[in-house]
């Protein structure tokens, strides 16, 4: 059943401090838009985020595709922008290894994701140990609260993340009520009757395009929100060729927020 509570109501009762903060931020900025900023240089990365910042609740990164990455040059300015525009950060790392390995991948290496990213995500293919490994890494790395999304469904054509795989991923999410805050999915994932309030973030959302040549499939904002999406993830629709990030940021923010108001019967 689709959750029709307001973001404020959900913030008041949620067990995760990350989810609480995110819901409150979404309500105060009146946005459920996440910008997926996949570009290859730090300068373009930061410039786009600065332009889109006023319209978003969350920025989604693939930090390992930035050719000139450095912690001081890329992450420190990103954190400054997150404070300037009041948004949270989601590193779309898609961890998919045993618990001990992901623990090191999350906390260390070049990117030190646990130090700066509020939210990250993981596949369920290796079992529930991945949740415990990531949670331990977060606890040992920072005093700041962190949250995990499980990849339950994908928007790409031919994805095998459905059916039994999705069901098993949901079961893994149930192993930790505080750290696992929700899913990357195309619809509501249930759990309310067992006391879970999972946040559903959905990629593959577009107001204009229906897909691309590499298997991406787009659904409309109204369609995804009405079936349970809490946060719409938009990338090329915001800053692709011929698109103005300021114009598109406002356009998608309004579309997402209006769909949320409709779902929660506030209009």
Swiss-Prot record:
It comes from the Eukaryota. The keyword Lyase applies. InterPro entries: Aldolase_TIM, OMPdecase, OMPdecase_AS, OMPdeCOase_dom, RibuloseP-bd_barrel. GO terms for biological process: 'de novo' pyrimidine nucleobase biosynthetic process; 'de novo' UMP biosynthetic process. Pfam families: OMPdecase (PF00215). SMART domains: OMPdecase (SM00934). Its EC number is 4.1.1.23. GO terms for molecular function: orotidine-5'-phosphate decarboxylase activity. Pathway: Pyrimidine metabolism; UMP biosynthesis via de novo pathway; UMP from orotate: step 2/2. Gene3D superfamilies: Aldolase class I (3.20.20.70). PROSITE patterns: OMPDECASE. The active site is at 94 (proton donor). Keywords: Decarboxylase, Lyase, Pyrimidine biosynthesis. GO terms for cellular component: cytosol. Substrate binds at residues 38, 60-62, 92-101, 218, 236. It catalyses: orotidine 5'-phosphate + H(+) = UMP + CO2. Belongs to the OMP decarboxylase family. This is Orotidine 5'-phosphate decarboxylase. It comes from Scheffersomyces stipitis (strain ATCC 58785 / CBS 6054 / NBRC 10063 / NRRL Y-11545) (Yeast).
